[in-house]
Amino acid sequence: MCVVKTTLIDSYAAQCWKCLKVRSIESQEDYEEIRSKTLEKFFECKRCEEPGDMVMNFDSLTMRWFQDEHSIPKTPQGLKRVLVVRTNCVKVDVYYESLAPRRKRFKSIKEVATFIEDKEEFKDMTLEEVSFAAPKRLKLKKKPVDSHSSSRNTEEDGVSRDA
């Protein structure tokens, strides 16, 4: 999961499969390691007895929650995966940036392909290591109110996985 306080996603969290508590993840690299293995190994925090690091508040005006697809590969060495939230706070744009000495931002797989063809140090990198799949925003999903009930209901876990 990604936590957004600004237009750039720079905070990361994961939910423990055992205790279901949300844990802050130290760095983007650590988060990508967890995310790349989610289909073969679920995240386990090893601190289940302790309180969670944060609570997912979907009604917050200052924080938005986004969820990545499972098993997106780790970003290749020499590149950085950049996630930018659009101004409407609903969708995320994914970019890759080359690191020093000159930063260059890539908006498509075609641009990345051209870049790795031109750079000797990236000759071992494959395009399967790059994913422009954007995280989806998590939000409460309200069920339609029937004529016999005036309360608003949510899905069982309160989270909509739909975009």
UniProtKB/Swiss-Prot annotation:
Biological process according to GO: chromatin remodeling
Keyword DNA-binding on entry: yes
Cellular localisation: Nucleus
CDD domains the record matches: MeCP2_MBD
Compositional bias per record (Basic and acidic residues), positions renumbered to this chain: 153-163
Listed name of the protein: Methyl-CpG-binding domain-containing protein 3
Domain annotation MBD: ranges: 65-137
Zinc finger residue extent: CW-type: 6-56
Location of the region described as Disordered in the Swiss-Prot/TrEMBL record: 140-163
Keyword Endoplasmic reticulum annotated: no
GO MF annotation terms: methyl-CpG binding; zinc ion binding
InterPro entries linked to this entry: DNA-bd_dom_sf (IPR016177), Methyl_CpG_DNA-bd (IPR001739)
Function: Probable transcriptional regulator.
Keywords linked to the UniProt accession: DNA-binding, Metal-binding, Nucleus, Transcription, Transcription regulation, Zinc, Zinc-finger
GO CC list: nucleus; NuRD complex
Domain observations: The methyl-CpG-binding domain (MBD) functions both in binding to methylated DNA and in protein interactions.
Pfam family, one: MBD
